Protein backbone atom coordinates (compact mmCIF):
# COMPACT_ATOMS: atom_id res chain seq x y z
CA UNK A 1 0.00 0.00 0.00
CA UNK A 2 1.42 3.40 -0.94
CA UNK A 3 -0.29 6.63 0.04
CA UNK A 4 0.89 9.84 -1.57
CA UNK A 5 1.47 13.17 0.17
CA UNK A 6 3.19 16.47 -0.48
CA UNK A 7 4.61 16.56 3.04
CA UNK A 8 5.32 13.80 5.57
CA UNK A 9 6.14 14.93 9.10
CA UNK A 10 7.75 12.41 11.46
CA UNK A 11 6.96 13.12 15.10
CA UNK A 12 3.73 14.52 16.54
CA UNK A 13 5.21 16.75 19.21
CA UNK A 14 4.51 20.50 19.14
CA UNK A 15 6.98 21.11 16.29
CA UNK A 16 5.62 18.20 14.27
CA UNK A 17 1.91 18.88 14.48
CA UNK A 18 2.46 22.62 13.95
CA UNK A 19 4.56 21.86 10.83
CA UNK A 20 1.80 19.57 9.57
CA UNK A 21 -0.85 22.27 10.06
CA UNK A 22 1.36 24.84 8.33
CA UNK A 23 1.77 22.46 5.39
CA UNK A 24 -2.01 22.19 5.05
CA UNK A 25 -2.34 25.98 5.26
CA UNK A 26 0.07 26.19 2.31
CA UNK A 27 -2.12 23.85 0.27
CA UNK A 28 -0.27 20.58 0.82
CA UNK A 29 -1.67 17.10 1.40
CA UNK A 30 0.00 16.13 4.69
CA UNK A 31 0.74 12.96 6.66
CA UNK A 32 1.91 12.91 10.28
CA UNK A 33 3.78 9.85 11.59
CA UNK A 34 3.99 9.16 15.34
CA UNK A 35 5.25 6.04 17.10
CA UNK A 36 3.51 6.78 20.40
CA UNK A 37 0.80 9.29 21.37
CA UNK A 38 0.04 12.63 19.76
CA UNK A 39 1.73 15.46 21.63
CA UNK A 40 5.26 14.11 21.91
CA UNK A 41 7.46 13.86 24.97
CA UNK A 42 6.49 17.17 26.59
CA UNK A 43 2.79 16.38 26.64
CA UNK A 44 2.94 12.67 27.42
CA UNK A 45 6.02 12.03 29.54
CA UNK A 46 7.65 15.36 30.37
CA UNK A 47 6.47 18.88 31.07
CA UNK A 48 2.70 18.49 31.27
CA UNK A 49 2.42 15.38 33.48
CA UNK A 50 5.18 16.69 35.75
CA UNK A 51 3.59 20.11 36.16
CA UNK A 52 0.17 18.57 36.76
CA UNK A 53 1.57 16.55 39.67
CA UNK A 54 3.67 19.48 40.95
CA UNK A 55 0.52 21.64 41.05
CA UNK A 56 -1.11 19.10 43.38
CA UNK A 57 2.02 19.10 45.59
CA UNK A 58 1.99 22.91 45.74
CA UNK A 59 -1.67 22.93 46.81
CA UNK A 60 -0.90 20.32 49.48
CA UNK A 61 1.94 22.49 50.79
CA UNK A 62 -0.28 25.59 50.85
CA UNK A 63 -2.96 23.73 52.80
CA UNK A 64 -0.35 22.66 55.35
CA UNK A 65 0.67 26.32 55.73
CA UNK A 66 -2.91 27.42 56.47
CA UNK A 67 -2.53 27.98 60.22
CA UNK A 68 0.29 30.51 59.66
CA UNK A 69 -2.15 32.79 57.83
CA UNK A 70 -5.14 32.13 60.06
CA UNK A 71 -6.69 29.35 57.98
CA UNK A 72 -7.73 26.23 59.83
CA UNK A 73 -8.08 23.05 57.80
CA UNK A 74 -8.05 19.40 58.67
CA UNK A 75 -4.78 17.61 57.97
CA UNK A 76 -4.61 17.32 54.17
CA UNK A 77 -3.94 13.90 52.70
CA UNK A 78 -2.69 12.86 49.27
CA UNK A 79 -4.55 10.23 47.27
CA UNK A 80 -1.90 9.23 44.70
CA UNK A 81 -4.38 7.15 42.73
CA UNK A 82 -6.54 10.26 42.28
CA UNK A 83 -3.48 12.41 41.46
CA UNK A 84 -2.52 9.94 38.70
CA UNK A 85 -6.11 9.78 37.45
CA UNK A 86 -6.30 13.57 37.19
CA UNK A 87 -2.95 13.68 35.37
CA UNK A 88 -4.18 11.04 32.90
CA UNK A 89 -7.41 13.00 32.32
CA UNK A 90 -5.47 16.21 31.60
CA UNK A 91 -3.20 14.40 29.12
CA UNK A 92 -6.13 12.70 27.39
CA UNK A 93 -7.97 16.01 27.01
CA UNK A 94 -4.90 17.62 25.42
CA UNK A 95 -4.31 14.61 23.12
CA UNK A 96 -7.94 14.80 21.98
CA UNK A 97 -7.44 18.48 21.20
CA UNK A 98 -4.47 17.67 18.96
CA UNK A 99 -6.37 14.81 17.29
CA UNK A 100 -9.23 17.22 16.61
CA UNK A 101 -6.79 19.68 15.01
CA UNK A 102 -5.46 16.90 12.78
CA UNK A 103 -8.98 15.88 11.74
CA UNK A 104 -10.13 19.46 11.15
CA UNK A 105 -7.08 20.09 8.97
CA UNK A 106 -7.50 16.76 7.13
CA UNK A 107 -4.05 15.54 8.16
CA UNK A 108 -3.58 11.77 7.83
CA UNK A 109 -2.09 10.37 11.04
CA UNK A 110 -0.08 7.15 10.91
CA UNK A 111 0.90 5.41 14.14
CA UNK A 112 4.22 3.65 13.69
CA UNK A 113 7.91 4.30 13.24
CA UNK A 114 8.73 6.46 10.23
CA UNK A 115 11.94 5.85 8.30
CA UNK A 116 13.06 8.13 5.49
CA UNK A 117 14.09 5.87 2.61
CA UNK A 118 14.98 8.59 0.11
CA UNK A 119 13.85 12.09 -0.88
CA UNK A 120 10.43 10.84 -1.88
CA UNK A 121 9.65 7.79 0.24
CA UNK A 122 8.96 7.16 3.91
CA UNK A 123 8.35 3.71 5.36
CA UNK A 124 6.00 3.48 8.33
CA UNK A 125 6.47 0.30 10.35
CA UNK A 126 3.41 -0.63 12.40
CA UNK A 127 2.59 -3.71 14.44
CA UNK A 128 0.46 -5.17 11.63
CA UNK A 129 2.98 -4.51 8.84
CA UNK A 130 4.35 -1.53 6.92
CA UNK A 131 2.91 1.29 4.85
CA UNK A 132 4.77 3.21 2.19
CA UNK A 133 4.26 6.92 1.84
CA UNK A 134 5.47 8.71 -1.25
CA UNK A 135 4.97 11.87 -3.29
CA UNK A 136 1.47 12.71 -4.47
CA UNK A 137 2.66 13.57 -7.97
CA UNK A 138 4.23 10.74 -9.95
CA UNK A 139 7.99 10.92 -10.35
CA UNK A 140 9.00 11.53 -13.95
CA UNK A 141 12.26 9.95 -14.98
CA UNK A 142 13.98 10.46 -18.33
Kindly give the residue locations of the regions a language model identified.
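Beta1/beta-strand and adjacent pyrophosphate-binding region of the FAD-binding site
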Residues: 2-15
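Short alpha-helical segment within the catalytic ATP-binding CA
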Residues: 18
Amino acid sequence: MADKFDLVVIGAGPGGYEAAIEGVQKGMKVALVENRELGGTCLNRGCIPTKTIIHTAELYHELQSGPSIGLTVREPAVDMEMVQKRKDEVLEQLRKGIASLMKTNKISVYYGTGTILDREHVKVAVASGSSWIGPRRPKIES
